[in-house]
C-alpha cells in the first residue's frame, strides 16, 4: 500500500492490516472487497464512512481502489467499484464520494461528477460524488 503512504505517513503497516481486518468479512460500512486471479491478489476497493478528515460531513466514501499492473484495463476496478456501490445501496446511502489524484477520467466514465478540486495532505485531488443506483 505504498501508493498512498504519503497521504497517511503515520499509519503503520500493522495499522493498515488492522483496519483491513476490521472491515473484512462483514456487511455494511466499512467493507473491503478484493479481486483475485488464481492465487494472486490483483485489486481492492473499500467502502468507508470517511476518507478525508477535512470533509467529515460527506459520507460514505469509495476508497483504496487499486489494481495491480498487468491486470489493469480489464474491468477489475469497474467490478470492484460496482460491488462497493451495491454495499453502499444496501446501507441506504443515496450519494457517495471519493477523492483521486490521478484517476478522474476513469470515475467520470463510471458516472461520477466533480464536486471540487482542492489541496489535501500536500497534493491536489479531485473530490467527486455519485448518485447511488440500487
Question: What annotation goes with each model-predicted range?
Answer:
Residues 29-33, 58, 124-128:
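Short beta-strand micro-motifs in enzyme catalytic cores
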Residues 32-34, 40-50, 61, 66:
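Conserved beta-strand in the GNAT
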Residues 36-38, 130-131:
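Active-site beta-strand termini and strand-to-loop segments that position acidic
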Residues 63-67, 73-86:
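Conserved acetyl-CoA-binding loop-helix of GNAT-fold acetyltransferases
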Residues 94-103, 116-134:
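C-terminal "cap" of GNAT-fold acetyltransferases
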Residues 108-118:
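Conserved acetyl-CoA-binding loop of GNAT-fold acetyltransferases
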Amino acid at each position: 500500500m505504498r501508493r498512498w503512504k504519503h497521504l497517511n505517513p503515520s499509519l503503520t503497516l500493522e495499522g493498515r492490516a488492522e483496519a483491513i481486518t476490521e472491515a473484512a468479512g462483514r456487511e455494511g460500512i466499512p467493507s473491503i472487497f478484493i479481486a483475485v486471479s488464481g492465487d494472486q491478489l490483483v485489486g481492492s476497493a473499500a467502502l468507508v464512512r470517511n476518507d478525508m478528515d477535512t470533509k467529515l460531513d460527506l459520507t460514505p466514501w469509495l476508497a483504496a481502489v487499486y489494481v495491480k499492473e498487468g491486470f489493469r484495463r480489464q474491468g477489475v476496478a469497474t467490478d470492484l467499484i460496482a460491488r462497493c456501490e451495491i454495499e453502499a445501496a444496501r446501507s441506504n446511502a443515496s450519494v457517495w464520494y471519493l477523492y483521486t489524484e490521478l484517476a478522474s477520467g476513469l470515475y467520470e466514465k463510471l458516472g461520477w461528477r466533480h464536486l471540487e478540486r482542492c489541496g489535501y495532505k500536500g497534493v491536489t485531488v479531485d473530490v467527486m460524488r455519485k448518485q447511488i443506483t440500487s
